[in-house]
Amino acid sequence: MTEKHTTPDGLVIVDKPSGFTSHDVVAKMRGIARTRRVGHAGTLDPMATGVLVLGVERATKLLGHLALTEKEYLGTIRLGQTTLTDDAEGEITGSRDASKVTWEAIDAGVAELSGDIMQVPSKVSAIKIKGVRSYKRAREGEEFEIPARPVTVSSFAVYDVRDAVADDGTPVLDLVVSVTCSSGTYIRALARDLGAGLGVGGHLTALRRTRVGPYKLDGARTLDQLQQELTVMPVADAAGAAFPRWGVDARRARLLANGVRLEMPEEYTGVGAVAVFDPEGRLLALVEEHKGKAKSLAVFG
Protein backbone atom coordinates (compact mmCIF):
# COMPACT_ATOMS: atom_id res chain seq x y z
CA MET A 1 0.00 0.00 0.00
CA THR A 2 1.40 3.42 -0.98
CA GLU A 3 1.98 5.84 1.90
CA LYS A 4 0.07 9.09 1.44
CA HIS A 5 2.24 12.19 1.65
CA THR A 6 0.86 15.16 3.57
CA THR A 7 2.48 18.51 2.90
CA PRO A 8 2.67 20.71 6.01
CA ASP A 9 1.52 24.25 5.39
CA GLY A 10 3.19 27.28 6.86
CA LEU A 11 5.98 29.77 6.38
CA VAL A 12 9.48 28.57 5.57
CA ILE A 13 12.39 30.91 6.29
CA VAL A 14 15.15 30.03 3.82
CA ASP A 15 18.82 31.01 3.90
CA LYS A 16 19.12 31.58 0.15
CA PRO A 17 22.42 30.52 -1.44
CA SER A 18 24.32 32.73 -3.85
CA GLY A 19 23.65 32.07 -7.52
CA PHE A 20 19.96 31.25 -7.02
CA THR A 21 17.16 33.56 -8.08
CA SER A 22 14.22 33.83 -5.70
CA HIS A 23 12.20 31.83 -8.26
CA ASP A 24 14.90 29.12 -8.24
CA VAL A 25 14.37 28.78 -4.48
CA VAL A 26 10.59 28.52 -4.96
CA ALA A 27 11.09 25.81 -7.60
CA LYS A 28 13.41 23.89 -5.26
CA MET A 29 10.92 24.17 -2.40
CA ARG A 30 8.14 22.83 -4.61
CA GLY A 31 10.20 19.68 -5.01
CA ILE A 32 11.04 19.45 -1.31
CA ALA A 33 7.45 20.03 -0.15
CA ARG A 34 5.96 18.09 -3.08
CA THR A 35 3.41 20.78 -3.89
CA ARG A 36 2.98 23.50 -6.49
CA ARG A 37 1.52 25.86 -3.86
CA VAL A 38 4.70 27.69 -2.90
CA GLY A 39 5.31 31.44 -3.15
CA HIS A 40 7.77 33.99 -1.81
CA ALA A 41 7.56 37.42 -0.20
CA GLY A 42 10.18 39.89 -1.35
CA THR A 43 13.02 39.21 -3.77
CA LEU A 44 16.77 38.74 -3.39
CA ASP A 45 19.21 39.29 -6.25
CA PRO A 46 20.98 36.10 -7.44
CA MET A 47 24.32 37.23 -5.97
CA ALA A 48 22.82 37.84 -2.52
CA THR A 49 22.38 35.30 0.26
CA GLY A 50 20.24 35.22 3.37
CA VAL A 51 16.65 35.48 4.53
CA LEU A 52 13.92 34.71 1.99
CA VAL A 53 10.38 34.12 3.28
CA LEU A 54 8.38 31.37 1.53
CA GLY A 55 4.78 30.29 2.02
CA VAL A 56 3.71 26.67 1.51
CA GLU A 57 0.10 25.61 0.85
CA ARG A 58 -2.38 27.77 2.84
CA ALA A 59 0.42 30.06 4.02
CA THR A 60 0.66 31.48 0.49
CA LYS A 61 -2.47 33.46 1.46
CA LEU A 62 -0.42 35.29 4.10
CA LEU A 63 2.40 36.43 1.85
CA GLY A 64 0.78 39.50 0.34
CA HIS A 65 -0.24 40.79 3.77
CA LEU A 66 2.98 40.32 5.76
CA ALA A 67 4.50 43.59 6.99
CA LEU A 68 8.01 43.02 5.65
CA THR A 69 8.72 46.72 5.42
CA GLU A 70 12.10 46.84 7.20
CA LYS A 71 15.13 44.80 6.17
CA GLU A 72 18.69 44.37 7.42
CA TYR A 73 21.79 43.53 5.40
CA LEU A 74 25.51 42.92 5.74
CA GLY A 75 27.54 43.68 2.65
CA THR A 76 30.81 44.67 1.04
CA ILE A 77 31.14 47.79 -1.11
CA ARG A 78 34.16 48.21 -3.39
CA LEU A 79 35.23 51.81 -3.96
CA GLY A 80 37.23 52.45 -7.12
CA GLN A 81 35.26 50.51 -9.72
CA THR A 82 31.83 50.82 -11.34
CA THR A 83 29.90 48.04 -13.07
CA LEU A 84 26.96 47.83 -15.44
CA THR A 85 24.74 46.28 -12.75
CA ASP A 86 26.14 48.16 -9.71
CA ASP A 87 27.23 44.79 -8.30
CA ALA A 88 29.85 42.13 -9.00
CA GLU A 89 27.60 40.35 -11.52
CA GLY A 90 28.07 43.05 -14.18
CA GLU A 91 31.02 43.96 -16.37
CA ILE A 92 33.35 46.67 -15.10
CA THR A 93 32.61 50.02 -16.71
CA GLY A 94 35.24 52.16 -15.01
CA SER A 95 38.22 52.07 -12.62
CA ARG A 96 39.79 54.82 -10.52
CA ASP A 97 42.40 54.82 -7.75
CA ALA A 98 40.53 54.91 -4.42
CA SER A 99 43.53 54.59 -2.11
CA LYS A 100 43.43 58.27 -1.09
CA VAL A 101 39.80 58.20 0.09
CA THR A 102 39.73 58.87 3.86
CA TRP A 103 37.56 57.48 6.66
CA GLU A 104 36.23 61.00 7.21
CA ALA A 105 35.13 61.28 3.59
CA ILE A 106 33.49 57.86 3.75
CA ASP A 107 31.62 58.79 6.94
CA ALA A 108 30.38 61.99 5.30
CA GLY A 109 29.25 60.08 2.23
CA VAL A 110 27.40 57.52 4.33
CA ALA A 111 25.66 60.31 6.26
CA GLU A 112 24.41 61.80 2.97
CA LEU A 113 22.80 58.44 2.12
CA SER A 114 21.15 57.93 5.52
CA GLY A 115 17.65 58.82 6.67
CA ASP A 116 14.82 59.64 4.28
CA ILE A 117 16.42 59.93 0.85
CA MET A 118 15.48 59.88 -2.83
CA GLN A 119 17.10 56.92 -4.56
CA VAL A 120 17.38 56.06 -8.25
CA PRO A 121 17.14 52.24 -8.51
CA SER A 122 19.78 50.31 -10.44
CA LYS A 123 19.09 50.20 -14.17
CA VAL A 124 19.55 46.44 -14.25
CA SER A 125 16.51 45.72 -12.08
CA ALA A 126 12.97 44.39 -12.39
CA ILE A 127 11.39 47.85 -12.28
CA LYS A 128 9.09 48.46 -15.24
CA ILE A 129 9.58 51.53 -17.43
CA LYS A 130 6.57 52.01 -19.72
CA GLY A 131 5.67 48.35 -19.29
CA VAL A 132 9.14 46.92 -19.99
CA ARG A 133 11.53 45.63 -17.30
CA SER A 134 14.46 48.00 -16.95
CA TYR A 135 16.99 45.15 -17.10
CA LYS A 136 15.71 44.27 -20.58
CA ARG A 137 16.13 47.86 -21.72
CA ALA A 138 19.64 48.01 -20.21
CA ARG A 139 20.77 44.75 -21.84
CA GLU A 140 19.57 46.01 -25.22
CA GLY A 141 21.75 49.09 -24.81
CA GLU A 142 18.83 51.49 -24.57
CA GLU A 143 19.35 54.88 -22.95
CA PHE A 144 16.65 55.59 -20.36
CA GLU A 145 16.12 57.13 -16.94
CA ILE A 146 14.48 55.63 -13.86
CA PRO A 147 12.72 58.19 -11.65
CA ALA A 148 14.06 58.59 -8.11
CA ARG A 149 11.78 57.34 -5.37
CA PRO A 150 11.66 57.83 -1.61
CA VAL A 151 13.30 55.22 0.63
CA THR A 152 14.37 55.20 4.26
CA VAL A 153 17.86 54.13 5.32
CA SER A 154 17.50 54.04 9.09
CA SER A 155 21.04 52.74 9.65
CA PHE A 156 24.10 52.70 7.36
CA ALA A 157 27.31 51.80 9.20
CA VAL A 158 30.85 51.04 8.02
CA TYR A 159 32.65 48.47 10.19
CA ASP A 160 35.92 48.10 8.32
CA VAL A 161 37.87 49.63 5.43
CA ARG A 162 40.33 47.33 3.67
CA ASP A 163 42.96 48.22 1.08
CA ALA A 164 42.82 45.93 -1.95
CA VAL A 165 43.96 45.71 -5.56
CA ALA A 166 41.44 44.93 -8.30
CA ASP A 167 42.15 42.40 -11.05
CA ASP A 168 43.11 45.22 -13.42
CA GLY A 169 45.66 46.56 -10.92
CA THR A 170 43.57 49.48 -9.64
CA PRO A 171 44.03 50.30 -5.93
CA VAL A 172 40.57 49.99 -4.39
CA LEU A 173 38.94 50.04 -0.95
CA ASP A 174 36.56 47.35 0.30
CA LEU A 175 34.07 48.55 2.92
CA VAL A 176 32.30 46.10 5.24
CA VAL A 177 28.89 47.65 5.92
CA SER A 178 25.54 47.02 7.55
CA VAL A 179 22.30 48.59 6.35
CA THR A 180 18.81 48.72 7.85
CA CYS A 181 16.33 50.10 5.36
CA SER A 182 12.79 50.21 4.05
CA SER A 183 11.42 47.80 1.49
CA GLY A 184 12.32 48.89 -2.03
CA THR A 185 15.80 50.16 -1.13
CA TYR A 186 18.56 48.96 -3.47
CA ILE A 187 21.81 48.27 -1.61
CA ARG A 188 23.52 48.18 -5.01
CA ALA A 189 22.35 51.74 -5.57
CA LEU A 190 23.74 52.80 -2.17
CA ALA A 191 27.12 51.37 -3.22
CA ARG A 192 26.93 53.15 -6.58
CA ASP A 193 25.93 56.48 -5.03
CA LEU A 194 28.52 56.32 -2.24
CA GLY A 195 31.28 55.75 -4.80
CA ALA A 196 29.95 58.49 -7.06
CA GLY A 197 29.81 60.97 -4.19
CA LEU A 198 33.43 60.17 -3.30
CA GLY A 199 34.51 60.66 -6.92
CA VAL A 200 35.88 57.15 -7.44
CA GLY A 201 32.84 55.04 -8.26
CA GLY A 202 31.63 51.99 -6.39
CA HIS A 203 29.72 48.76 -6.59
CA LEU A 204 28.46 45.99 -4.32
CA THR A 205 30.60 42.84 -4.15
CA ALA A 206 28.75 40.82 -1.48
CA LEU A 207 25.36 40.98 0.22
CA ARG A 208 23.68 38.95 2.94
CA ARG A 209 20.16 39.70 4.18
CA THR A 210 19.99 39.06 7.90
CA ARG A 211 16.40 40.12 8.62
CA VAL A 212 13.10 40.71 6.83
CA GLY A 213 10.43 42.18 9.10
CA PRO A 214 10.33 39.88 12.16
CA TYR A 215 12.11 36.98 10.41
CA LYS A 216 15.82 36.67 11.19
CA LEU A 217 18.74 34.67 9.87
CA ASP A 218 19.02 32.60 13.05
CA GLY A 219 15.59 31.14 12.24
CA ALA A 220 16.44 30.37 8.61
CA ARG A 221 17.42 27.00 7.12
CA THR A 222 19.47 26.19 4.05
CA LEU A 223 17.90 24.27 1.19
CA ASP A 224 20.06 21.26 2.08
CA GLN A 225 18.77 21.35 5.66
CA LEU A 226 15.19 21.65 4.43
CA GLN A 227 15.75 18.72 2.08
CA GLN A 228 16.66 16.63 5.13
CA GLU A 229 13.84 17.97 7.30
CA LEU A 230 11.16 20.40 6.13
CA THR A 231 10.75 22.89 8.97
CA VAL A 232 7.72 25.17 8.70
CA MET A 233 6.18 27.81 10.92
CA PRO A 234 2.52 26.68 11.12
CA VAL A 235 0.03 29.08 9.54
CA ALA A 236 -1.66 29.91 12.86
CA ASP A 237 1.69 30.63 14.55
CA ALA A 238 2.87 32.73 11.61
CA ALA A 239 -0.33 34.77 11.56
CA GLY A 240 -0.32 35.23 15.33
CA ALA A 241 3.25 36.51 15.21
CA ALA A 242 2.81 38.79 12.21
CA PHE A 243 -0.61 40.38 12.80
CA PRO A 244 -2.72 41.75 15.67
CA ARG A 245 -4.73 38.89 17.19
CA TRP A 246 -8.53 39.00 17.57
CA GLY A 247 -10.13 36.15 19.50
CA VAL A 248 -13.83 35.56 18.86
CA ASP A 249 -16.32 33.29 20.62
CA ALA A 250 -17.87 30.21 19.01
CA ARG A 251 -20.99 32.05 17.85
CA ARG A 252 -19.06 34.76 16.05
CA ALA A 253 -16.69 32.15 14.64
CA ARG A 254 -19.69 30.41 13.02
CA LEU A 255 -21.01 33.71 11.68
CA LEU A 256 -17.62 34.54 10.20
CA ALA A 257 -17.40 31.09 8.60
CA ASN A 258 -20.78 31.74 6.98
CA GLY A 259 -19.59 34.99 5.43
CA VAL A 260 -21.15 37.40 7.91
CA ARG A 261 -19.19 40.65 8.29
CA LEU A 262 -18.73 41.01 12.03
CA GLU A 263 -18.59 44.26 13.95
CA MET A 264 -14.93 44.92 14.84
CA PRO A 265 -13.69 46.38 18.12
CA GLU A 266 -12.43 49.96 17.80
CA GLU A 267 -8.90 48.92 18.78
CA TYR A 268 -8.44 47.36 15.32
CA THR A 269 -9.41 50.48 13.38
CA GLY A 270 -6.68 51.49 10.95
CA VAL A 271 -4.20 48.75 11.92
CA GLY A 272 -4.40 46.81 8.66
CA ALA A 273 -4.66 43.03 8.58
CA VAL A 274 -5.88 41.29 11.77
CA ALA A 275 -5.72 37.54 12.45
CA VAL A 276 -9.00 36.07 13.77
CA PHE A 277 -8.87 33.00 16.05
CA ASP A 278 -11.65 30.84 17.48
CA PRO A 279 -11.77 29.75 21.17
CA GLU A 280 -9.67 26.65 20.37
CA GLY A 281 -6.89 28.77 18.89
CA ARG A 282 -7.64 27.88 15.26
CA LEU A 283 -6.90 30.55 12.67
CA LEU A 284 -10.15 31.48 10.94
CA ALA A 285 -9.27 34.41 8.69
CA LEU A 286 -7.31 37.54 8.03
CA VAL A 287 -9.59 40.56 8.08
CA GLU A 288 -9.31 44.33 8.08
CA GLU A 289 -11.65 46.94 9.47
CA HIS A 290 -13.84 48.65 6.88
CA LYS A 291 -16.56 51.03 8.07
CA GLY A 292 -16.56 49.34 11.46
CA LYS A 293 -16.91 45.79 10.11
CA ALA A 294 -14.57 42.93 9.34
CA LYS A 295 -13.69 42.69 5.67
CA SER A 296 -12.14 39.30 4.81
CA LEU A 297 -8.70 39.29 3.21
CA ALA A 298 -8.07 35.54 3.40
CA VAL A 299 -10.14 32.70 4.88
CA PHE A 300 -8.55 29.70 6.60
CA GLY A 301 -11.25 28.19 8.82
UniProtKB/Swiss-Prot annotation:
Catalyzed reactions: uridine(55) in tRNA = pseudouridine(55) in tRNA
Enzyme class, spelled out: isomerase
Keywords, comma-separated and alphabetical: Isomerase, tRNA processing
Calcium as UniProt keyword: no
GO biological process, one term: tRNA modification
Listed GO MF terms: pseudouridine synthase activity; RNA binding; tRNA pseudouridine(55) synthase activity
Listed Pfam families: TruB_C, TruB_C_2, TruB_N
Annotated catalytic residues: D45 (nucleophile)
UniProt-listed SUPFAM superfamilies: Pseudouridine synthase (SSF55120), PUA domain-like (SSF88697)
Coiled-coil intervals: none
NCBIfam families to which the protein is assigned, alphabetical: TruB
Function description: Responsible for synthesis of pseudouridine from uracil-55 in the psi GC loop of transfer RNAs.
UniProt record similarity statement: Belongs to the pseudouridine synthase TruB family. Type 1 subfamily.
Protein name, entry field: tRNA pseudouridine synthase B
Gene this protein is translated from: truB
